[in-house]
Structure formats: structure tokens, C-alpha cells
Amino acid sequence: MGEFKVDKFNIEDFFSGDLDIFNYSSGMPSILPDAVPCHSENLEINSYAVVVIYVLVTLLSLVGNSLVMLVILYNRSTCSVTDVYLLNLAIADLFFALTLPVWAASKVNGWTFGSTLCKIFSYVKEVTFYSSVLLLACISMDRYLAIVHATSTLIQKRHLVKFVCIAMWLLSVILALPILILRNPVKVNLSTLVCYEDVGNNTSRLRVVLRILPQTFGFLVPLLIMLFCYGFTLRTLFKAHMGQKHRAMRVIFAVVLVFLLCWLPYNLVLFTDTLMRTKLIKETCERRDDIDKALNATEILGFLHSCLNPIIYAFIGQKFRHGLLKIMATYGLVSKEFLAKEGRPSFVSSSSANTSTTL
């Protein structure tokens, strides 16, 4: 797609409001006030505070997810199906976090990195988001099959999980293609550029399509899969009094719960905004202002998710802590007496290695 040219752009097709009031945009702008000529009272968010948050999230994610990958790869001889999924999840979170410094820099001076980097960073962030939620759905199906429908052929999944992960990454690459094609630097006022979908005169229609795509395949469908699988998994665990396996599932449940707490608010607000843009909900200036503020706040909450999984593993995952301490003891960073005092975590006994996780 060529360079964005203001003289060929009908600004009334993109916005119907006063552009000078638009002082803040997210890294992936989704809230441009294009529905009614409203004057926001306070849409501006302290951009430097957002920069600090993004930098901290990036650092925590780099350290935490790198340690997760190290522990899993160090114990790859005993790596379970779930561990492979969690390894890919850590990779996705790591790459997601690597894009945050660029979005943080764009908070202060707008997008100054050109069209190519706009496409690349937007695409990487979109692919990693899709892959994260799809991998979580795969984990839920794996636990459902392992516990609710345990069979003698379950061990074969160890050889299939790599292909499942590759398929999820390829699906994420395909689902994110519209972002790669349409993202370009777009002017929102005389001096500020944002990295956003350049869809010309078809703004409203294509924007709704670009909203429905990630909301449906990147959140709603995986969410329904997770609710179904974990609902039946929990019922089976409680009915069979499988307390040991239930304790082993705590990390997985915590990972899914944190994902929902981080991304559900944003997706609910985004869904409400989509209904408003399609005129299914009456739009007023007050509602537009509330939606814009909510989208800004909940998007930041969603970005925090990329650094939280390693924290969950550290506090809940006994095997992760032991695995990390074992690596540190190998290189003399902690004493072997301290490692012995911590004790080796008991593994869940099973006819299949699929029901045990390193974390």
C-alpha cells in the first residue's frame, strides 16, 4: 500500500469530530472519535505514565518469560504436552512485549518510525495476541481430553503437540494479515501521526470487520472452548475426588483466569463500541467519551498480561521454582543444601506423561 496522502483523504469519511481534541492514542489505535461531533472533556491520558508502565511490563516480560523458556528447555527430557504449550505461550508473550517499547515511544511524539515498521510491529503484536489465546484454548482441550476422556492412546499426543503448535502459529499469521495489509501511519491532526488502519473511504465498514475478526476468532471462540473444557474437567475432578491432579491443575487455571481478567474488560468495551458504531446502540457524546476512556484504560490492562504468567509460575508452580533452583545450583548460584531443603516436588502419577507439567 502506498504512502498516505492527506490531499487524497476525505477526512469527513474518517472522522466526524474535532480532531484537535484527540490527544492520546493506544499503540494500536482503536478509539478514534469518528461517530458523532463530540468534544471530549478529558480524553487525554498522561502519556509519560503509560510509557513507564510499558517499559516496566517489557522488562518483567523479558526476564520472566526467558526464565520460563529456560526451565522448560532445561527439563525437555521430561517435557509434557502442557509444557510444550506453555513454552510457546512464553514465546508469544515475549515477542508481544518486545513491541511495547515502540508503542511507548509513540505515546510522546506520535508515530515517527515510518510505514514499514508500522506494519511489522502491528503485525507481530497481532500474531502474538492470536497465538496466546489459541494456545490457551489448546491447553484447555488437552486437559479436557487427558482427564475427562483419558485413553491408552493419549501418549501419542506428545508427538502431535508440536504440529498443533505450528498450526496455531500459522492460523495466527493468517488471522493477522488484514493488519499487515492495512496498517499505515495516519494523520489525526496537523502534527501527529498514529499507526492505524488506512482504509480510505470505507472506514466505517472495514473498521467493523477488523473489530469482529479478532473479537470472534481471537477471543470469543477460544473463550467458549475454554469454558466448555474446563467446566467438564472440573466436574470430573470433583466427582472422582482426584485431589492430586486438581492441585496440579492450579497453575493452568490461574493462567486462564489471569488472561480473562486482563483481556475480558477490553473485549467487552470493544464489543460495546462496535455495537455503537453499527448503530445497534444509540451513540451520544457522553457514551462516546466514556467508551474512549474505558478503551484506553482496559487496553493498558490487557498489555500487562504479557508479564504475568511467569509471576504465576513463581508463586504457584512448585515444579517451576524447583526447576529454576536446580539450574541455579548447577551453576553455583545457590547451594545444593538450599536446594535439598526446598525439596523435590512430587509429580502426579499417571499412565501418561501428558498429565504432568513442569510448571
From Swiss-Prot:
Residues 75-83, 142-162, 231-250, 315-359 are cytoplasmic. The chain crosses the membrane at residues 48-74, 84-104, 120-141, 163-182, 208-230, 251-272, 294-314. One of its GO terms (molecular function) is chemokine receptor activity. Residues 1-47, 105-119, 183-207, 273-293 are extracellular. Disulfide bonds join 118-195. It is a multi-pass membrane protein. Glycans are attached at residue 23. It is found in: Cell membrane. Its main location: membrane. Pfam families: 7tm_1. The keyword Glycoprotein applies. GO terms for cellular component: cell surface; mast cell granule; mitotic spindle; nucleoplasm; plasma membrane. Keywords: Cell membrane, Chemotaxis, Disulfide bond, G-protein coupled receptor, Glycoprotein, Membrane, Phosphoprotein, Receptor, Transducer, Transmembrane, Transmembrane helix. Phosphorylated upon ligand binding; which is required for desensitization. Receptor for interleukin-8 which is a powerful neutrophil chemotactic factor. Binding of IL-8 to the receptor causes activation of neutrophils. This response is mediated via a G-protein that activates a phosphatidylinositol-calcium second messenger system. Binds to IL-8 with high affinity. Also binds with high affinity to CXCL3, GRO/MGSA and NAP-2. Belongs to the G-protein coupled receptor 1 family. This is C-X-C chemokine receptor type 2. It comes from Mus musculus (Mouse).
